[in-house]
Structure formats: C-alpha cells, structure tokens
Amino acid sequence: RGFDAAVNEGIRESRTPYVFLLNNDTKVRPGCISAMEARMEREKELFSDSARMVDMRNPEIMDGAGDLYSALGWAYAIGKGKPAAYYGKPRKLFSACAGAAIYRKSALELTGDFDESHFAYLEDVDIGYRARILGFSNAYEPSAVVLHAGSATSGSCYNEFKVFYSARNNVYLIYKNMPPLQILLNAPLLLAGFAVKTLFFLKKGYGGTYVKGFCE
C-alpha cells in the first residue's frame, strides 16, 4: 500500500496534538521529540518541524535538515553530505522531511492526509506545499537529532523503484500544487530541470526509468 497509506493509518489512530513520523532505518537521540514538541508549542503557525538528520555511519556529516524545493522543480535534502556543524541554527524551510518530523494534528485536518497516490517519495514535500498554501510554515530544529542509515528499505541511493517514483511524483507535485500561471512562467526552468535530471540518470544507467516515471 506504500508509505503514505501506512502513515495515514497511524495518524488517524493518534489521539495527541502532534504526530511524530520516523523512518525504520533511524536512531533517535535523547531529547529529540521533546525539543520538537516545545518548538511547536512556541510557534503556533508551524505545520511541521524537521529533525536534524545525520549520517548513522558518521554523525559529523548531515543527512538532511529538511527539504528545499527549487525553481527547477527539484526537491532535495538541505545540507546532505555537508558538515553537521554548519547546520546548528533553527530555520524555516519549504517542507519537513517525513523521515523524522513532527506534525500538528489540527493542521493535518486542514491539509488532508498524505497523498496516497504518491505511494513513496515526495509526499512530504507535497503536504508541506499544501500547508504553505494554507498559510502555515515549516521549520528545522537542530537540537532534535536523528541518525539515519539511508535507503535501507529501497536498497540503495539509486535504484529503479526510487528513480521511477521520484520522477513520477515530481511531475504530479507540480500538476497538483502549482497554479497554471506559475507553471507557465516557470516552464523554461522546469523543462531545463527535467532535462538535466534525464542526462544525470542516463549516466547512472536509469535514464529509461526516469523518463518512464516522468511520462507516467
């Protein structure tokens, strides 16, 4: 049924003001959830708060400080592969990474569930996008530390499953959330972004998979 269906089922069963989502290839350091909950209590406009995800093999290296969405139509983890020391300050961001993030239950009732059409990948960017449209914001909390192995479920950094769904969901994300005028104005950059990604995955041996996902 996919990541989104499982997450939605858990959220519906929850009876707390906040819900904490966590990947199955992580370890949570002490104080993580309490730090995120305190931030949500202080800043009532927050839809979500993303943890400081660091590499499980080398915690001095970042795995991600939430998600950024660029004009090229690319969504990616902020700070991935960079020194964790550079990401010690709280900040606002485009969306939280659902691999380790806390969400406001009352706001989820307004945005709706995680979109199960995604199945996997970019569902966190999609729901963060929807929350921003409704006037909420998303944040990064550096004192909430989570160690992340990375791609433990899908098997590797790049594989057919991940490349296909990432490409498909990238197009769906734009179609679903961007107004037609914004799509028109951003079209040159979006097309350039897709062209660069196609070339990148051709070199990785997944060009056909990426194009298939893009056209799905």
Predicted regions and their residues:
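Glycine-rich, basic loop-to-helix element that forms the pyrophosphate-binding segment
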Residues: 1-14, 35
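A short, conserved alpha-helix in the catalytic core of glycosyltransferases
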Residues: 94-147
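Conserved donor sugar-nucleotide recognition element shared by glycan-biosynthetic enzymes
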Residues: 3, 7, 32, 99-100, ...
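Acidic metal-phosphate-binding loop of nucleotide-sugar-dependent transferases
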Residues: 1, 25-27, 118
